[in-house]
Regions:
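Internal nucleotide-binding/catalytic subdomain
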Residues: 73, 77-170, 174-176
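A short linear hydrophobic-aromatic micro-motif
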Residues: 41, 59-62, 94-98, 169, ...
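Conserved protein kinase catalytic/activation segment
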Residues: 178-181
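Acidic/histidine-enriched active-site and ligand-binding environments that engage anionic O-linkages
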Residues: 54-61, 105
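Active-site "cap" helix and flanking loop/linker of ATP-utilizing ligase/carboxylase catalytic domains
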Residues: 149-170, 176, 186-229
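Conserved N-proximal alpha/beta basic substrate-recognition cap immediately N-terminal to
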Residues: 1-50, 56, 67-68
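Fold-independent oxyanion-binding glycine-rich loops
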Residues: 1, 15-16, 25, 35, ...
């Protein structure tokens, strides 16, 4: 509400709709799908009756719809018999139950879009987590060119669909068959992009400033392969 109030008289970039989407996993997943991308199978859990709705995926991860990050507000659920207890443990807060995805890699693409509609993507990077915290990023991601192109196209489509002016990191899963699923959005500079300060033509922070200030976007070519821990 505060961002929308400010936006009535002053440009806010990214626009308040991006904050609105990113604050709630239900809205985020609906937004991603509306943009033409796929997500892991999921169902919203908001009331007790939702615990027995058709189409629930097990095993799965029950995540609070809001205020969850770095593994907080998440519980693994092996079967339908465990779901009610897990929901109780999360305080019966609105949640999403995501089906577990057998992915081959976790990647992310950071995309910038200017007020003029120009778009620049940083190359896809591979991310490794330890205890839900990013531990290592490899740039560029060691994936097939066709998969990289697919990931970049998804990120660009999401940026255009949401009329982004700014920067958004699109976290994705790569499946064994080359399919790419979108996991989360972060409309800001992202920890998986810090490598760009040392190994990219334009780093993510400069690109963010350029995009929100109406300056031409910088090039995103990798100057040398990078590994960040």
């Amino acid at each position: 509400i505060a961002a929308e109030t400010i936006a009535a008289t002053t440009p806010v970039r990214p626009a308040p709709n991006w904050l609105h989407v990113a604050q709630d996993r239900r809205r985020e997943k609906a937004f991603v799908q509306a943009a033409g991308a796929q997500t892991a199978p999921y169902k919203a859990i908001e009331i007790e009756a939702d615990l027995i709705q058709p189409g629930l995926s097990f095993p799965g991860i029950l995540k609070t719809a809001q205020s969850g990050y770095d593994g907080k507000g998440q519980l693994r659920v092996a079967s339908a018999a465990d779901l009610a207890a897990a929901w109780q443990s999360l305080g019966q807060a609105p949640c999403v139950l995501e089906g577990l995805v057998q992915f081959e890699r976790e990647i992310s693409v950071i995309v910038a879009r200017g007020a003029d509609g120009a778009v620049q993507c940083f190359p896809p990077v591979e991310n490794h987590h330890e205890n839900h915290i990013l531990a290592e990023t490899i740039a560029p991601a060691p994936i097939a060119a066709s998969v990289a192109a697919k990931a970049v196209a998804l990120a660009e489509n999401i940026a255009r669909y949401g009329d982004l002016v700014g920067l958004v990191a699109v976290e994705m899963f790569v499946l064994a068959d080359g399919q790419v699923l979108v996991n989360e959005l972060a409309p800001r500079p992202h920890n998986s992009g810090h490598w760009s300060m040392d190994a990219c033509q334009t780093d993510q922070f400069e690109q963010c400033v350029r995009s929100v200030c109406g300056l031409p976007l910088g090039g995103t070519a990798i100057l040398a392969p990078a590994r960040m821990r």
